[in-house]
């Protein structure tokens, strides 16, 4: 009984830490997005081997954000991060149209996992500043996001991670939907 009361007190008084995982194919901009939230500035990144984790506070909410490596050899391990996830941020390189079908398959397989049944989905159509980048509506169609309607809360936003454009709106959507 004491443990239950301690947990209730901690979540009410101290506040819950919401778990967010950031997934996407390699070179989509996941790490750039994570560190933009942490430093509010552009940082130089290198391919993530395994994961990066940081805590970010926004509007009196505390997020633990896991940036998970997107190389093909690492994608099978994504499911080890799903437990108790509140939000999944899916980062898409909107300028790399040839790899959208790969991410579509990854996304739809991922969403069948029982640990993500209650997780909200935020798709960030990154690299909107690059020539030939698909807009968010085109990315949504290519990923088949319309099939998610009614099943769970989801949103797609355009962004440019290196400039920080669209990232505050993404956090705002998360904060408003938790």
UniProtKB/Swiss-Prot annotation:
Cellular component per GO? cytoplasm; trans-Golgi network
Which of UniProt's keywords are assigned here?
ER-Golgi transport, Golgi apparatus, GTP-binding, Lipoprotein, Myristate, Nucleotide-binding, Protein transport, Transport
Gene3D superfamilies, per database record: P-loop containing nucleotide triphosphate hydrolases (3.40.50.300)
Q: What does this protein do?
A: GTP-binding protein that may be involved in protein trafficking; may modulate vesicle budding and uncoating within the Golgi apparatus. Plays a role in the shedding of pathogen spores from intestinal cells.
Query: By its UniProt entry, which PROSITE patterns does this protein fall under?
Result: ARF
> One of this protein's GO BP terms?
microtubule cytoskeleton organization
Molecular function per GO = GTP binding; GTPase activity
Originating gene? arl-5
Family, according to the entry, reads as follows: Belongs to the small GTPase superfamily. Arf family.
PANTHER family with a match to the protein in the record: ADP RIBOSYLATION FACTOR-RELATED
Keyword Lipid metabolism attributed: no
What compartments host this protein?
Golgi apparatus
**Protein's recorded name:** ADP-ribosylation factor-like protein 5
- Chain residues that bind GTP: 24-31, 67-71, 126-129
Phenotype of the disrupted gene, per the record: RNAi-mediated knockdown results in disrupted clearance of intracellular pathogen N.parisii from intestinal cells.
Q: Name one Pfam family in it.
A: Arf
Which residues are the lipid attachment points (N-myristoyl glycine)?
A: 2
- What organism, scientifically named, is this protein from? Caenorhabditis elegans
Domain of life according to the entry? Eukaryota
């Amino acid at each position: 009984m004491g443990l239950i009361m301690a947990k209730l007190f901690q979540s009410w008084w101290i506040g819950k830490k919401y778990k967010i995982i950031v997934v996407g194919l390699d070179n989509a901009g996941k790490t750039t997005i994570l560190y933009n939230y942490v430093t509010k500035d552009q940082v130089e990144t290198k391919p993530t081997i395994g994961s990066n984790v940081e805590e970010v506070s926004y509007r009196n909410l505390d997020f633990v954000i896991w940036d998970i490596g997107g190389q093909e050899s690492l994608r099978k391990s994504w499911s080890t991060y799903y437990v108790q996830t509140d939000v999944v941020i899916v980062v898409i390189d909107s300028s790399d149209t040839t790899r959208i079908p790969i991410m579509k398959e990854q996304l739809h397989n991922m969403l069948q996992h029982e640990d993500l049944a209650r997780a909200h989905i935020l798709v960030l159509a990154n690299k909107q500043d690059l020539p030939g980048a698909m807009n968010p509506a085109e990315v949504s169609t290519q990923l088949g996001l319309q099939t998610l309607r009614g099943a769970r809360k989801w949103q797609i936003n355009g962004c440019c991670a290196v400039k920080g454009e669209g990232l505050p709106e993404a956090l705002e959507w998360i904060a408003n939907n938790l």
